[in-house]
Amino acid sequence: MAKRQLNRRQNWRIEKIQGERAARAAKRESATLETLEGGDLGPEQTGLVIAHFGVQVEVEAQEGEVTGQVFRCHLRANLPALVTGDRVVWRAGNQGIGVIVAQLPRTTELRRPDSRGQLKPVAANVDLIVIVFAPMPEPHANLIDRYLVAAEHAGIRPLLLLNKADLIDEQNAPALNALLAVYRTLGYPVLEVSAHHGDGMQSLQSQLDGHISVFVGQSGVGKSSLVNSLLPETDTRVGPLSEVSGQGTHTTTTARLFHFPRGGDLIDSPGIREFGLGHVSRADVEAGFIEFNDLIGTCRFRDCKHDREPGCALLKGLEDGRVQQQRMNSYRSIIASLPQDSY
């Protein structure tokens, strides 16, 4: 059934109702915060945000006698938006409730535009972004390349992970091998694993140890299954593929941080169908295609759009094999999706 289209007045009314609900929730939260701060709060200490639930977050204590314990914390109104992976200063209250009083500086930030085009952080202090895809649902180079551009733009090292390797067969093997070969040639690390059978999971674990990682990828590629395999004690629900669309049903409802026994953390974030890049410029996208680095700026014309212009270095690179057609197609698709003012 086609999705119902809402007119402007209906959209306005929905936003008005949502705004009123948010205001009521904020008022209740403010009253709770006043009660807490009016009571006996403990000293300031550092903590790690391991989950976010609207106006509250779960914080793991990082020092003192309560190190490792988890507290549900309220947020002061003057704080910026917090996300899983943030390091904060907080004070403990009664009955396992606390108050966050400050956000510590982030080393990295992974952001994406929300439905209104506003930038929204989704994870903080990450140093490894694991781009997960699988034989089913069919992987798309354009989506993988969007993640790679986002990783390069954020300064976060990427790892390409083909999950469900046990589903590779004679029909899909040629296309998958060709896809992986492009990224291996570029120097990106690529792993093939099967969370279901356990193949390659030790190699994946060694890549994750000592890092703060986040799994990204469309729904149905097995991110939750990977978490369950890496951390059997977790309770991450796994959803089946939709029989109608062949895409995954969303299971994880909030980004959550897990610890590995040998050190390092994993942030399991909600599955998303497409990673928006409306917040980046044309130059950012070009910088995100690492094989372009030696070519950008060498075109005959300074305002070259790398389409049909004579003397275009990227088109020459395409002819010479330095640039793969698959990547050029992704680049053009991403550029076409950017707002006009990003050019």
UniProtKB/Swiss-Prot annotation:
One of its GO terms (molecular function) is metal ion binding. Binds 1 zinc ion per subunit. Keywords: Cytoplasm, GTP-binding, Hydrolase, Metal-binding, Nucleotide-binding, Ribosome biogenesis, RNA-binding, rRNA-binding, Zinc. CDD domains: YjeQ_EngC (cd01854). One of its GO terms (cellular component) is cytoplasm. Zn(2+) binds at C299, C304, H306, C312. PROSITE patterns: ENGC_GTPASE (PS50936), G_CP (PS51721). Its EC number is 3.6.1.-. Its main location: cytoplasm. Belongs to the TRAFAC class YlqF/YawG GTPase family. RsgA subfamily. This is Small ribosomal subunit biogenesis GTPase RsgA. One of several proteins that assist in the late maturation steps of the functional core of the 30S ribosomal subunit. Helps release RbfA from mature subunits. May play a role in the assembly of ribosomal proteins into the subunit. Circularly permuted GTPase that catalyzes slow GTP hydrolysis, GTPase activity is stimulated by the 30S ribosomal subunit. Residues 116-275 form the CP-type G domain. The keyword Transport does not apply. It comes from Pseudomonas syringae pv. syringae (strain B728a). It is found in: Cytoplasm.
